[in-house]
Swiss-Prot record:
GO CC list: cytoplasm
GO biological processes: L-histidine biosynthetic process
UniProt KW Chaperone keyword: no
Transmembrane segments: none
The protein's name: Imidazoleglycerol-phosphate dehydratase
Main location: cytoplasm
EC number: 4.2.1.19
Metabolic or biological pathway, per its Swiss-Prot or TrEMBL entry: Amino-acid biosynthesis; L-histidine biosynthesis; L-histidine from 5-phospho-alpha-D-ribose 1-diphosphate: step 6/9
Subcellular location: Cytoplasm
Family statement: Belongs to the imidazoleglycerol-phosphate dehydratase family.
Amino acid sequence: MRSATVHRQTRETDITVEISLDGKGNSTIDTGIGFLDHMLTSFAKHGLVDLMIKARGDLQVDDHHTVEDIGISLGEAYRDALKEKTGIERFGHALVPMDEALAVVAVDISGRGYSVFKADFRQPKIGDYSTAMTRHFIDSFARSAGITINVKIEGEDDHHMVEAMFKALGLALSMAAAKNERRGIPSTKGVL
């Protein structure tokens, strides 16, 4: 079973992540940031991963450290759950609409953490979540997981835009991590 647990504790945050890549989309998320809980629940549901996240951060300052460290911890857990990456598809993509918004996410489980993020949000916050942290979450997750992630979001409602992106990320990662019995290591180099 492809699963992992990561615990990260700093002076700013205390985070535990448990993930099973071959799950059913069940989740228990408690980050202290209501909108982020909703997004990570959508990510798990559409990515068919079982996910538990318990996070405490210095939210009295702002949401930066908490969102960043959740991205780092989730990325580490995802990387650990994949293990040596033998027999995975490697590439995945998804186009997800949500009313007027459209999110396009493409991923490569390459071992090279990198992100490209294109979106223009209209509001600085959605509830208690800073929209600018969406880009930072993707970058932190990508670098920590060793996954290249390209994101492009269009739309008018920031909530719809961010939610479509989290759903698309879940779908794209599910596709890329899918097992393919015909594959060994999906690289001409022989390593990822």
